[in-house]
Amino acid sequence: MAKKALISVSKKEGIVEFAKKLNELGYEIISTGGTYNLLKENRVNVVKVSDITGFPEIMDGRVKTLHPKIHGGLLAIRDNEEHIKALKEHGIEPIDIVVINLYPFKETILKENVTLEEAIENIDIGGPSMIRAAAKNYKYVTILVDPKDYDTVIEEIKQYGNTKEETRFYLAAKAFGHTALYDSLIYNYLIQKNNIEFPEVMAFAYEKAQDMRYGENPHQKAAFYKNPIKAYGIAECEQLHGKELSFNNINDANAAIELLREFKEPAAVAVKHTNPCGVAIADNIYNAYLKAYESDPVSIFGGIVALNRTVDVKTAEELIKIFLEIVIAPDFEEEAFEILKKKKNLRILRLKEGYEKEYDLKKVEGGLLVQEKDEIDLDENNLKVVTKKAPTQKEMEDLRFAWKVVKHVKSNAIVLAKDGATVGIGVGQVNRIWPTEQAIKQAGSKAKGSVLASDAFFPFPDVVEAAVKGGITAIIQPGGSQNDALSIEAADKGGVSMIFTGIRHFKH
């Protein structure tokens, strides 16, 4: 009895060549619909599923392979006498290889203006059923869902007369991953259509983009996975030059891109260890970068710079003056790109347009914290001047700028800004006075005339007192402390204006 392979694929890559090789190795090919027609046109020896089942495709192809002669052939345990007896009694022949990839549900829902009905029609039923049946019976059946595995299967059949059990076991696991991804796409699409923000079950499936050399540290193994639907941000950056991105590169670049999105005007963001070390806006990208660099010329060394305008020659010439890990921008002038390429190891990334909202996830031991991203805008109507003195227009511009930056600094966070640039950043301290002192010390003489943004309220007036002493002229903070009155009193005493936003921006 000839061995049998059932082939039904939506992605036709390499399938004709694979089927022909199976023919040469003595396999009878069974197929359906478009795959059958393609194989037949290319002179592959193939029979229709309906010829095996004795039952036609019905309901516009919704029912094709859901038949005992297919699933019995897939699920029969070959060394079980009762199973073999059942096969013979019902005229069922074993199926040894199954090659399937599923209806293009992902591609369908990514189309513009796709209807729910169109999406539903692209939910595969027979395909996942056959994949699961074949994978369950991996000891006897080889299941293929990825064209990358075709050559391995052919080589093993040539060498051993069949695939090795360890290969079948691996392919079975891969097959269940394939259906898990498929089901998660359907589930999340339908949850979205039901407008459910936090469903009873969280089902995420990501596709591996690359293996990393190592993780956050050299002793940690790591890989990078992409969202198969929401393609944007660091996951979709195009690398134009330089070494492969590391785990930390990707993490830091992501932080830089998230902060960069806060600004519509030309902006430059420098990041180290996911924290901004220099941020600036200006009338052009060259000036924005110069201001960001001058914010902290020490910490930017070995950092990541993200820009939201095309990099010109002048800017490129400045960028190569120091060691940077990565430069990110929406585009690069040709000559500017050639200048940057002189730095052999500099990673150059082109940031593509596009952004989609998704959950902010935090892994904890034994669980997952899920929340909306912190993307609330500053509502000018809700700003409350709580001091006798109000900020000037120039101070107000810097306060808005500093507020955007402080949201992206690890708590407890303080940002000092002046003339559209950070001059001091206090990062990740366990009380509020220490990051204030850190930021003022870093700013030095630039602290005088700057403004201060705090990610959370002041529990004591000491922050305001330090700000007054450092020459800071205006403060923006959430407010809401039991001691707000003391902080307001200190601000009035020091001649400093202060605004409450009513919004906290903790970042952990």
Swiss-Prot record:
One annotated Gene Ontology cellular component of this protein: cytosol
EC number annotated for this UniProt entry: 2.1.2.3, 3.5.4.10
PROSITE patterns documented for this protein: MGS
Pathway annotation: Purine metabolism; IMP biosynthesis via de novo pathway; 5-formamido-1-(5-phospho-D-ribosyl)imidazole-4-carboxamide from 5-amino-1-(5-phospho-D-ribosyl)imidazole-4-carboxamide (10-formyl THF route): step 1/1; Purine metabolism; IMP biosynthesis via de novo pathway; IMP from 5-formamido-1-(5-phospho-D-ribosyl)imidazole-4-carboxamide: step 1/1
InterPro entries: AICAR_Tfase_dup_dom_sf, Cytidine_deaminase-like, MGS-like_dom, MGS-like_dom_sf, PurH-like
GO molecular function, one term: IMP cyclohydrolase activity
Keywords: Hydrolase, Multifunctional enzyme, Purine biosynthesis, Transferase
GO biological process: 'de novo' IMP biosynthetic process
Residue ranges of domain MGS-like in the record: 1-145
Cleavable signal peptide: none
Pfam families, per database record: AICARFT_IMPCHas, MGS
Catalytic activity: (6R)-10-formyltetrahydrofolate + 5-amino-1-(5-phospho-beta-D-ribosyl)imidazole-4-carboxamide = 5-formamido-1-(5-phospho-D-ribosyl)imidazole-4-carboxamide + (6S)-5,6,7,8-tetrahydrofolate; IMP + H2O = 5-formamido-1-(5-phospho-D-ribosyl)imidazole-4-carboxamide
TM ranges: none
Family per record: Belongs to the PurH family.
Domain notes: The IMP cyclohydrolase activity resides in the N-terminal region.
Protein name listed in UniProt: Bifunctional purine biosynthesis protein PurH
Natural source organism: Thermoanaerobacter sp. (strain X514)
Lineage: Bacteria, Bacillati, Bacillota, Clostridia, Thermoanaerobacterales
